[in-house]
C-alpha cells in the first residue's frame, strides 16, 4: 500500500514539476526556466528517494508479519502435538488397565469354575453320606423299637409331652414372677401418682347444713311473715316445701329443709318479701316463682363456670344445667358440685402423670355424678342415669363408660374409667369429706317423698319437721275428701312397711280447691 502511494506521489510530483516548468518557461526567462527545471529535478529525486525508503519499510513490515504468523502457527502446532501425545499416553494407560482387568476376570472365572466343581463333588459326597446315615438311623430305630417295644411315634409323643410339661412349668414360673414384679411396680407407681395428685390439689370444703337463716330488720317482721291466722307462713311453706321456724331467736327466721334447691328458693323469696314489705299469699306465689327463675339462672351459671374452670368445652347446655344443679345436692354432707370439680381436677392430674388425654379425664370426672342431679322420680342408680344422660346429649362412648363404671354398675375396661373410680374414692374417702349421719338423714327424707309421690293423684310432697311430718299435695280433681282420708292411711302403711325410723311420722294430705274469677 505504501509503495502505491509512493508511486502516485512521484507521478503527481513529476506532473506538477512539468506543469510548473511549462509555466515558468512561458512566463519567465530562460534562466528562470533552467532553475525551475533544476528544482523540479531535485524534487523528483527527493520523491524517488522517499519512495524507495517507504518501499523498503513496507517490505520489512511485511516480512515481520509473515515471521510472526509463522511463529504463532509453529507454537500452536507444538501445543496441539503435545496435547495429542498426552491423550495418546492416557489412552495407552487405559488400554493397559483394561487388559489387566480382563486377565483378572479370566482368572476369577477359572477359580469359580474350579470351586463350583469342588462344591458339586462335595454335594455328591454328602448325598451319599446322608443316604448312608438314613439307612443307619432306620436300622438303629428298628433295633430300638424292637428292644423298647415302642414305636418311634409313641416315643416322640412321650418326649414331646415331657418337654411341653417342662415348658409350661417354666412359663408359669416366669409369668408369676413377671406378674409379681408388675404388681409391685404398678402399686408403687399408683401410690406415687395418687400422692402427687393429692398434694397438687387441696380443695376447700365446708360441710352442708339443712338450715338457712334469714336476717330480719326487726322482730316486728315476724308477725307480718306469719300473717293473719298464719296464712302467710302456710302459703310460703306450701309454695316452697320448706319449714319456717320462727322462735325466740332475735331478728332471724330459720328455714329448715333437706332439699337445698327449695331452701335456696325459700331464702331468696323471703328476703325479697322482707325488702318489698308486701307479704300476702298472692304476692308470695309471685315472688317464689321469681326466686325459682333466679335459682335456675344461678344453676346455669354454675354449670358454665365449672366447665370454664376445668377448661372443657363443647358440653351440651342441658348437661351444664344438670352440673349446676349439683351445687344444691349433697352426698354424705359433701356438696356434689364441689366433689365433681375435685374429682375432675384429680383425674386431670393423674392423667397427665400417665400420659393420657387430660381434657378427656377432666370431662369424665366432672360428669361422673351427673345422675345425682336428677330428682328421685327417675328410677335407677345415679351412675346408670348419668351414663344415659351423657349418651343422650352426645358424649363419647369412653365418657359414658367411665360414668357407668365408677360404681361397678359396669366392669371398667379402660384407664379412664379406673381413673374416675380412683379420683372419686380420693375425694370422698379423705378425712372430713363426708358424714354418714347426714346422708342417712337426707336419704330418709327422700324416701318419704318418694313413697308419697308413688300414689295416684299426688301432685307433690314435702318432708318437713326433720322427717317427722310429710305433707302430701293432691289434685282436687282426682282425689275427693273421702279418698284423701284413705290415701293418708295407705301412705302411712307403706311408710311403716318400707322404712325404719325413730318415733312416728305424721302424714298430712292436703286437698286445696281454688275458685278464680276476674272482674272486668
From Swiss-Prot:
It is a single-pass membrane protein. It holds the Pfam family HD. The keyword Lipoprotein does not apply. GO terms for molecular function: RNA binding; RNA endonuclease activity. Disulfide bonds: none annotated. It comes from the Bacteria. Coiled coil: none annotated. One of its GO terms (cellular component) is plasma membrane. The chain crosses the membrane at residues 3-23. The keyword RNA-binding applies. SUPFAM superfamilies: Eukaryotic type KH-domain (KH-domain type I) (SSF54791), HD-domain/PDEase-like (SSF109604). Its EC number is 3.1.-.-. Residues 210-273 form the KH domain. It is found in: Cell membrane. Its main location: membrane. One of its GO terms (biological process) is mRNA catabolic process. Keywords: Cell membrane, Endonuclease, Hydrolase, Membrane, Nuclease, RNA-binding, Transmembrane, Transmembrane helix. Endoribonuclease that initiates mRNA decay. Belongs to the RNase Y family. This is Ribonuclease Y. The lineage of its organism: Bacteria, Pseudomonadati, Thermodesulfobacteriota, Desulfuromonadia, Geobacterales.
Amino acid at each position: 500500500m505504501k509503495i502505491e502511494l509512493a508511486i502516485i506521489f512521484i507521478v503527481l510530483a513529476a506532473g506538477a514539476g512539468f506543469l510548473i516548468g511549462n509555466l515558468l518557461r512561458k512566463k519567465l526567462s530562460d534562466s528562470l526556466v533552467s532553475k525551475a527545471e533544476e528544482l523540479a529535478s531535485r524534487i523528483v529525486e527527493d520523491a524517488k528517494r522517499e519512495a524507495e525508503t517507504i518501499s523498503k519499510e513496507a517490505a520489512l513490515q511485511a516480512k515481520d508479519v509473515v515471521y510472526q504468523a509463522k511463529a504463532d502457527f509453529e507454537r500452536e502446532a507444538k501445543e496441539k502435538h503435545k496435547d495429542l501425545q498426552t491423550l495418546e499416553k492416557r489412552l495407552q494407560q487405559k488400554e493397559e488397565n483394561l487388559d489387566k482387568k480382563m486377565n483378572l476376570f479370566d482368572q476369577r472365572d477359572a477359580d469359580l469354575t474350579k470351586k463350583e466343581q469342588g462344591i458339586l463333588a462335595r454335594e455328591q459326597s454328602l448325598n451319599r453320606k446322608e443316604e448312608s446315615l438314613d439307612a443307619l438311623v432306620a436300622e438303629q430305630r428298628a433295633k430300638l423299637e424292637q428292644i423298647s417295644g415302642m414305636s418311634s411315634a409313641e416315643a416322640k409323643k412321650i418326649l414331646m409331652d415331657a418337654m411341653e410339661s417342662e415348658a409350661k412349668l417354666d412359663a408359669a414360673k416366669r409369668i408369676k414372677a413377671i406378674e409379681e414384679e408388675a404388681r409391685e411396680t404398678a402399686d408403687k407407681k399408683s401410690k406415687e401418682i395418687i400422692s402427687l395428685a393429692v398434694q397438687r390439689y387441696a380443695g376447700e370444703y365446708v360441710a352442708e347444713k339443712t338450715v338457712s337463716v334469714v336476717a330480719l330488720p326487726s322482730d316486728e317482721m315476724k308477725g307480718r311473715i306469719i300473717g293473719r291466722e298464719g296464712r302467710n307462713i302456710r302459703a310460703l311453706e306450701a309454695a316452697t316445701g320448706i319449714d319456717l321456724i320462727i322462735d325466740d331467736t332475735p331478728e332471724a327466721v330459720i328455714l329448715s329443709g333437706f332439699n337445698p334447691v327449695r331452701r335456696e328458693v325459700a331464702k331468696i323469696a323471703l328476703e325479697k318479701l322482707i325488702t318489698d314489705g308486701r307479704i300476702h299469699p298472692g304476692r308470695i306465689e309471685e315472688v317464689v316463682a321469681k326466686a325459682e327463675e333466679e335459682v335456675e339462672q344461678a344453676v346455669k351459671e354454675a354449670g358454665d363456670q365449672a366447665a370454664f374452670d376445668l377448661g372443657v368445652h363443647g358440653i351440651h347446655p342441658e348437661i351444664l344445667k344438670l352440673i349446676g344443679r349439683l351445687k344444691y345436692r349433697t352426698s354424705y354432707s359433701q356438696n356434689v358440685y364441689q366433689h365433681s370439680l375435685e374429682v375432675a381436677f384429680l383425674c386431670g392430674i393423674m392423667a397427665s402423670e400417665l400420659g393420657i388425654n387430660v381434657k378427656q379425664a377432666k370431662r369424665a370426672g366432672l360428669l361422673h355424678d351427673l345422675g345425682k342431679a336428677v330428682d328421685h322420680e327417675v328410677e335407677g342408680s345415679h351412675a346408670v342415669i348419668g351414663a344415659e344422660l351423657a349418651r343422650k346429649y352426645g358424649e363419647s362412648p369412653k365418657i359414658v363408660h367411665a360414668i357407668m363404671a365408677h360404681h361397678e354398675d359396669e366392669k371398667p375396661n379402660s384407664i379412664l374409667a379406673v381413673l374416675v373410680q380412683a379420683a372419686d374414692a380420693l375425694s370422698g374417702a379423705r378425712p372430713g369429706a363426708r358424714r354418714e349421719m347426714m346422708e342417712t338423714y337426707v336419704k330418709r327424707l327422700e324416701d318419704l317423698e318418694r313413697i308419697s309421690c308413688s300414689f295416684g293423684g299426688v301432685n307433690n310432697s314435702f318432708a318437713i319437721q326433720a322427717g317427722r311430718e310429710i305433707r302430701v299435695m293432691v289434685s282436687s280433681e282426682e282425689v275427693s275428701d273421702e279418698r284423701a282420708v284413705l290415701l293418708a292411711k295407705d301412705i302411712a302403711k307403706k311408710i311403716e312397711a318400707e322404712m325404719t325410723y325413730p318415733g312416728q311420722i305424721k302424714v298430712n294430705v292436703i286437698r286445696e280447691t281454688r275458685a278464680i274469677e276476674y272482674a272486668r
